[in-house]
Amino acid sequence: MQMTYERFKWKTESKALPQNTVTAGSCRFTVLTERLIRIEYDSAQRFTDEASQVVFHRNFPESCFTVSECDGVTEIKTEYLTLKYKAGSCLTKETLSVELRQAPSTKWNFGEEIRQLKGTACTLDGINGALELEDGVCSRGGITILDDSCSLLLTEDGWFKNRESEETDCYVFAYGHDYKSCIADFYRLTGIPPLLPAYALGNWWSRYHRYTQQEYCDLIERFQK
């Protein structure tokens, strides 16, 4: 008997609009916004439409972009960026590039290290001194990468599974210095983090004062009001 996990099922919209996707050889590009592009590479063209542990929503509105081919190079152009890929090739710094069309006019070649502004730390437990932060999605250079290649995929019954192959699955955030829009679209892609309702936290009160019993009673009555 197969177990179901209804309570663990996430609401996802993982399949992108067909008109936002471009396939060139073993690569599939999904233009989620004019500044956010998903890049997939799989030699067998086994591309993934399922949600992952990181990415829940790819059903973005139709994007405005053009596609052209010249001398074996596929070019995707939006108002904000130009992506070039040498069709039929593996992903290397010579075969794939993304360039901003506006300031700071950064060009990123696949595999190059990106100096990010970093993100957050999950916990400060056991930390005494400096802490290396996790990668974020903002950069002074204007281009960052979210690599989703190693995350598990979500199944229809609310469980997880491994990917069928060691494919490349990453997202290019080309937002320049518009950090607010970058983070907003990151949450559109991954979903808003769930928050505990305020009532579940109870009353939090901290004050260095020697309360009497009556003062505690008065304080609780204030909270009730």
Located regions from the model:
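Short, Gly/Pro- and small/polar-rich lid/capping loops
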Residues: Q2-A16
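A low-complexity, Ser/Thr/Gly/Pro-enriched, surface-exposed linker/loop concept
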Residues: Y5-R7, L32-D71
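Short, hydrophobic/aromatic-rich segments at coil-to-beta transitions
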Residues: E13-T21, D71-E75
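Catalytic and substrate-binding clefts that recognize carbohydrates or anionic sugar/phosphate headgroups
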Residues: S68-A200, R207-Y208, I220-E221
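Acidic-and-aromatic substrate-binding clefts and catalytic sites of carbohydrate-active enzymes
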Residues: Y208-Q214
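Catalytic domains of carbohydrate-active enzymes, especially glycoside hydrolases
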Residues: E215-K225
